[in-house]
Curated annotation (Swiss-Prot):
It is a multi-pass membrane protein. The keyword Membrane applies. The lineage of its organism: Bacteria, Bacillati, Mycoplasmatota, Mycoplasmoidales, Mycoplasmoidaceae. It comes from the Bacteria. It is found in: Cell membrane. This is Uncharacterized protein MG255. Its main location: membrane. The chain crosses the membrane at residues 105-125, 151-171, 187-207. Keywords: Cell membrane, Membrane, Transmembrane, Transmembrane helix. One of its GO terms (cellular component) is plasma membrane.
């Protein structure tokens, strides 16, 4: 049902979207059977976020690809950790641009020389973010070890249990082998055993080096919020007081982000997800977070002790009963009115189209 109270609440929320200096985190809840909540869940499941390095895209928001393209990918964690991390990385990557940089002034020759160094630094920073993105999306060393583990184990086993004994016996019994089987068989056994041992040694070396790199990758993931917080503090200015600082980047207004679902069995990732959302909020993003009504109390218990998260959080209850047929008809009509295509669909654009409080009420209530 539409009501003045609902319109007033949503007026407040969407006024915040138009104030880039005061972005908020809005937590909305409803019963899992509620069709409008299920609709958002289906959108979130169908259009998976993918970190895209497309420098020609001025907005550089996360693109949402058809679920068919990503159905074989394995999510790194639960609790929306990977989705939130991907969004934050995309925002940081997109803000590392010349027009966002507070450039130095002075002697033109020194400035040109310095700008060349700044360009190299910018390329290096983007490389670091790309590397972290691979960690988050299981495309780094950890993924390599997981995929190649059976092969590496087999090769090491062949080298240690087959190659070494064959080589020892061949050398010890070389005279008998040459007399009974011939010189060609002796040469074959030597080549086979040396090759097997070499495979085992190389596989062991690859596994050792990969394991060392994976330790660094795991440490980065375990403290990703702290790593990205230091990155932001060092290379971006967050308020007007720092705007005169040179060599720092300014965040663009990055629109609306939508996330849904938290797995409370993954407590460490839940904590990190909330910390990453605080960082995302600092980058001028307006954040909508959906959850089931039964989970809101658990989420509040996580939010309340964190004073920063508490101050930036606003709770909205979307509980409402509506038939499935009515809701689907409403969504189909809404898509036609907004001229949205399911083939070229951006979730951020969807929320951008809903600009008035009355329009939002018609969608959510």
């Amino acid at each position: 049902m539409e009501s003045e109270n609902q319109i007033a609440i949503l007026d407040y929320i969407f006024n915040q979207v138009n104030q880039p200096n005061q972005p908020k985190i809005v937590w909305f809840s409803g019963e899992g059977e509620d069709e409008k909540i299920n609709f958002l869940i289906r959108l979130n499941d169908f259009f998976k976020p993918k970190f895209v390095e497309n420098t020609n895209d001025s907005s550089f928001l996360l693109s949402f690809r058809n679920h068919v393209e990503t159905k074989n990918s394995t999510p790194l964690t639960q609790a929306n950790f990977a989705n939130i991390a991907n969004k934050l990385l995309a925002v940081l990557f997109g803000s590392l641009q010349w027009k966002q940089l507070n450039k130095p002034t002075g002697n033109w020759f020194l400035v040109i020389l310095f700008l060349a160094l700044l360009w190299l630094r910018q390329c290096w920073l983007k490389l670091q973010l790309t590397k972290i993105s691979k960690f988050v999306n299981q495309k780094g060393i950890l993924s390599f070890i997981k995929q190649q583990w059976p092969i590496l184990t087999t090769l090491v086993t062949v080298g240690t249990t087959l190659g070494t004994p064959v080589f020892s016996l061949t050398i010890a019994q070389q005279d008998g082998i040459k007399q009974n089987a011939g010189n060609d068989v002796f040469i074959f056994l030597i080549i086979f055993s040396v090759f097997s041992i070499s495979l085992g040694l190389v596989s062991s070396l690859i596994f050792l080096v990969s394991s060392l790199f994976s330790i660094r990758q795991k440490k980065t993931l375990d403290a990703l919020d702290k790593v990205l917080s230091k990155f932001i503090d060092k290379y971006f200015f967050l308020d007007e007081k720092e705007i005169k600082k040179q060599l720092k980047y300014q965040f663009k207004n990055n629109g609306v982000c939508f996330f849904y679902g938290f797995d409370f069995d993954q407590a460490e990732f839940l904590e990190q997800s909330m910390n990453l959302m605080l960082l995302l909020k600092q980058t001028n993003c307006f954040i909508l977070v959906g959850c089931k009504e039964s989970e809101m109390t658990l989420i509040k218990n996580k939010i309340e002790p964190n004073i920063n998260l508490k101050q930036n959080s606003f709770y909205l209850d979307l509980s409402n009963e509506i038939s499935q047929v009515e809701q689907i008809s409403k969504f189909n009509l809404l898509f036609r009115q907004l001229r949205l295509s399911s083939e070229l669909f951006y979730l951020e654009d969807f929320f951008d189209y809903l600009t008035t409080a009355k329009q939002i009420v018609n969608f959510l209530f």
